[in-house]
Swiss-Prot record:
Its main location: nucleus. It is found in: Nucleus; Cytoplasm; Cell projection, Dendrite; Synapse. Keywords: Cell projection, Cytoplasm, Nucleus, Phosphoprotein, Repressor, Synapse, Transcription, Transcription regulation. GO terms for cellular component: cytoplasm; dendrite; nucleus; synapse. This is TSC22 domain family protein 4. The modification Phosphoserine is found at S62, S165, S187, S189, S219, S254, S258, S271, S362. It comes from Mus musculus (Mouse). Forms a homodimer or heterodimer. Forms a heterodimer with TSC22D1 isoforms 1 and 2. Interacts with NRBP1. Residues 1-85, 135-232, 368-387 are annotated as: Disordered.
């Protein structure tokens, strides 16, 4: 098998001396010989399971030399542990492979936590707990066909905020039947919950009581995410439940994960206008503009927040340019006023000199001035021929 499906195999529980063919009647419902030493662990059907040291043949080993090869065949099993049956002189019980390599366990755990982020931590933790017994734990859905269920003894409870701690599995399997198991309600103090990851859409839910429902035909079990102490000897086997199996698409969070993608207009800090009429504030204005970018970038706002910051920078730059232009125009006006003042003084001096020259000139010289056609303020022309 590949992916999250389990490998199927069988386990030899006892060996008898008599031999019966594979097709003999009553081969599948014969009882298990009770000649076993020590208190063995219990199977779901109540029959004792011998310790690993009493097995006649290893799980994946080869049959004895004198046994026919047709006695062993691969059988596809439904979910749950099968009934003991006879194969010749072998009494066998179908079990599931739960061997998981330790190096790949961490990577598989991280992959499942990332893949099941939309369904919340509750279903993932319940699947991890019940997988220690090799039981499939898809997410419970309304309207799902219910198969035969088995009894589960509730785990021991301990006082305090952590109301339950699982040690070495969920409980001990008892006789078959159709039932559900409910543990007593939690104490008044709420249990400590694991904080949901950044990608989880559903937060962990706190239930007033723990309901565990295990079905051999593909039912579901759900537990709230309580803190657990797992035994080191227990090997977990996890199974991903596709949305097509459960008939319900897992809810997703429409909001993005990064908090920087949200923008609150009330968090934008608009700096006051640092410009004034005096020219001494221009240097401090330039320095404040250099510090604006660091001030706006320190906020967590992005997207529209950065656009508002850019608009503020543009407005401040335009105000700065306008103030510098006003300063330059004022300086040019002052320079032009000085030049006009100098020219006016020079013009007054020339008019005064011209008046003095007219007063000192002879009548003949004054008579030649209009005939020459020269302007009055121009330089003196050479004397023309007398009339």
């Amino acid at each position: 098998m590949s992916g999250g499906k389990k490998k199927s195999s069988f386990q030899i529980t006892s060996v008898t001396t008599d031999y019966e063919g594979p097709g003999s009647p009553g081969a599948s419902d014969s009882p298990v010989p009770p000649a076993l030493a020590g208190p063995p662990p219990r199977l779901p059907n109540g029959d004792p399971n011998p310790d690993p040291g009493g097995r006649g043949t290893p799980r994946n080993g080869s049959p004895p030399p004198g046994a026919p090869a047709s006695r062993f065949r691969v059988v596809k099993l439904p979910q749950g542990l099968g009934e003991p049956y006879r194969r010749g002189r072998w009494t066998c019980v179908d079990v599931y492979e739960r061997d998981l390599e330790p190096p790949s366990f961490g990577r598989l755990l991280e992959g499942i936590r990332g893949a099941s982020g939309g369904t919340g931590g509750r279903s993932l933790d319940s699947r991890l707990e019940l997988a220690s017994l090799g039981i499939s734990t898809p997410i419970p859905q309304p309207g799902l066909s219910q198969g035969p269920t088995s009894w589960l003894r509730p785990p021991p409870t301990s006082p305090g905020p952590q109301a339950r701690s699982f040690t070495g599995g969920l409980g001990q399997l008892a006789g078959p039947g159709k039932a559900k198991v409910e543990t007593p309600p939690l104490s008044a103090s709420p249990p400590q919950q694991r904080p949901p990851g950044p990608g989880t859409g559903d937060s962990a839910q706190t239930l007033p009581s723990l309901r565990v429902e295990v079905e051999s035909g593909g039912s579901a079990a759900a537990t709230p995410p309580l803190s657990r102490r797992r035994d080191g000897a227990v090997r977990l086997r996890m199974e991903l439940v596709a949305p097509a199996e459960t008939g319900k698409v897992p809810p997703t969070d429409s909001r993005p994960n990064s908090p920087a993608l949200y923008f609150d207009a009330s968090l934008v800090h608009k700096s006051p206008d640092p410009f004034g009429a005096a020219a001494a504030q221009s240097l401090s204005l330039a320095r404040s503009m250099l510090a604006i970018s660091g001030h706006l970038d320190s906020d967590d706002d992005s997207g529209s927040g950065s656009l508002v910051g850019i608009d503020n920078k543009i407005e401040q730059a335009m105000d700065l340019v306008k103030s510098h232009l006003m300063f330059a125009v004022r300086e040019e006006v002052e320079v032009l006023k000085e030049q006009i003042r100098d020219l006016a003084e020079r013009n007054a001096a020339l008019e005064q000199e011209n008046g003095l020259l007219r007063a000192l000139a002879s009548p003949e010289q004054l008579a030649q001035l209009p005939s020459s056609g020269l302007p009055r303020l121009g330089p003196s022309a050479p004397n023309g021929p007398s009339i």
